[in-house]
């Protein structure tokens, strides 16, 4: 076999190898950035996250951005998948949550929690047991009303 034929074979094998590596790349390489706004007023009333329900995949990053001052975003300890890293944002700053485990992540704005400022992030498929556990979490009345609406969107 000539040198040119060997070079052509090497190029072809290299291209096939590159395509195989891309096909086998981890899902995190395809992760999305999802923006959630923290607002004083929105479509669902006062003190809201918009959107209040987000469906994400493992590896996605959710960015909670203050559209108005006096908000933060933090995970709810009683509504967080086992092994997931909690997140507690600083007032008036973007809070970033990269989801690493499938399940339901409850989010609250601490200063406005009792006013119903909550959100829900669904990561991957949720088991019936996880959904039942999230529905059983005790929340302040207005937060419970909004969380119930978000939980109804879980599929």
Language-model features and meaning:
Residues 3-16:
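Bacterial N-terminal signal peptides that target proteins for export
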Residues 7-10, 23, 101:
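Residues at the start of alpha-helices and the adjacent loop-to-helix junctions
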Residues 14-25:
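Bacterial N-terminal signal peptides
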Residues 27-155:
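Extracytoplasmic copper-binding redox domains, predominantly the cupredoxin/blue-copper superfamily
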């Amino acid at each position: 076999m000539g040198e040119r034929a060997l070079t052509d074979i090497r190029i072809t094998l290299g291209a096939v190898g590159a395509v195989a590596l891309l096909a086998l790349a981890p899902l995190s390489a395809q992760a999305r950035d999802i923006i959630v706004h923290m607002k004083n007023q929105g479509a669902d009333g006062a003190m809201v996250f918009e959107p209040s329900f987000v469906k994400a995949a493992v590896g996605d990053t959710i960015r909670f951005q203050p559209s108005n001052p006096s908000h933060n975003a933090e995970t709810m300890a009683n509504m967080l998948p086992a092994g997931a890293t909690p997140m507690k944002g600083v007032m008036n700053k973007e809070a970033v949550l990269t989801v690493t485990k499938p399940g339901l992540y409850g989010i609250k704005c601490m200063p406005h929690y009792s006013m119903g400022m909550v959100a829900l992030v669904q990561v991957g498929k949720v088991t019936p047991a996880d959904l039942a556990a999230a529905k059983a979490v005790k929340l302040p009345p207005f937060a419970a009303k909004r969380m119930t609406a978000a939980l109804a969107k879980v599929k």
